[in-house]
Amino acid sequence: MFFIIYLIIFSTIILFIIDLILIYFPKSKLEIIPQKYKINSKEVLFEFKIINQSNNKETMVPDLDIELNGLDDGNLINLPYKKELVIDDGEMKQNLKNYWKTIIIKSNSFVKVYLKANVRDELIENKSIWLKINWSNYGHFGFIRKQNCFLLRKNNTIYKAKKLINIPGNNKNYTTIAVKTEILGIFDEPVKTISDYCKDIVKKGDYLIIGETPLAIMQGRYINPINIKYSLYSKLLCYFFHPTSSLATACGMQILINNIGITRIIYA
């Protein structure tokens, strides 16, 4: 009996130590926060911030590249374009046309980046844009690569259900209907988007449910799996969950570990 108690206490201490190591292990605290955008007939304007949330560590961005594709009815369209970047750190502006210059972002500060992309021989005003930022961070944590993707919706987007899908169920007193939408992004306001899509569908007494993933995307909480640093613990623990669960992947498990720690997961 005492052996079991000692074993539980010892295991708990070990798990706490592992949690502390994961919490304080050096990591990049740079984040990209989109601000606004504008799509003209042959031009895309996009503004974002690179924020350093560290209280005492500077971090370098040695490389940053932006890719643009047209998005029409869910299909990516190749867009030949010429881009120009302007970096504003609050003290001076740098105009970068052909390459990215390594920048240093001080602790608890940010830089603004302005993208201007001129599209060649393509009218894109009525198309959405899929914008991908491939960048790297270098600092006390080492060197890592990151990727952020944003949907820049076309100017004349009308939020209207593309398709209504009846989902069969066991309860004959209820009817379940799935509302197919356009691809959603961080610039879509959740309440307005849901209201516009469902205003002609939902009736009094209906229950309206939105999926966790599209809501997280619109709220900017979605985490690109490329940006997650996986540990051995996430790869082991994910085996103990149902195959269809997001926790059955190292990606989903690592996010849970980052949020609540291994100790709570083990004893849950």
Describe each model-derived feature in a short phrase:
Residues F2-A268:
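N-terminal and secondary-structure boundary signal
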